[in-house]
């Protein structure tokens, strides 16, 4: 991709972001007019300390894929979502698209959740580029299985400054693009979607108590209404940091990707506020700029003005 084209897209994104922040009266700590939108830097474009705390990386793109991300704090006291995407030099291996994107939603107090999600995303991301990227001797199934156990142990062992267990946890989703194949990992209730031909398909399954309640619905033990109104329906039954990690979702067969496909990774802060059709509409409006689309998705969630808005994060991967 030419530098001039990249610059135009980044400038369009920055213009929209500035207008949005001004309209919503969120004060940014970055002077967007002076932000360098260079293709070499996947630098932070917006990070504010106002009501929502917007964090977005500048566009990552080559001739094969576009990658964008955005994260907002919502109305919480801390940002416990963690998002890790590759830089330009980590997208290709010998002209072969090969990269990993990771998202995690932490839980466990002001600092516990933040540390748990950061531990999960950074461990998986670093290990992927150390083990799988150049000299791959493992299958994705074996790699993801081993990483799930490793990360669960690491998160469970996190301690505070006094040496006391943090008792924190985190969801974890990861999408690995390898040529025309998609491999993914899921622990918890963050989601991965595939948008193809105007339709949005959820690839992962939520690992929460509602899953077990719906099994009882199918067996006739309770009604669907009872399941959907159960006070503990959203409680996680699998997450990084749990005593015994028994539920890890990995696709056994790689998903074959097509030109025009968009892979969406998001925390529950997004899909609980936006319908699938609302997400599709944003993606269709901003089809050629995944960074702007990511920002618009988190902005749309924020515009719902939900009093208890959770941290909201999204990663978008478009196959050209």
Regions found by a protein language model. Give the residues of each.
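PP2C/PPM-type serine/threonine phosphatase catalytic domain
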Residues: 1-320
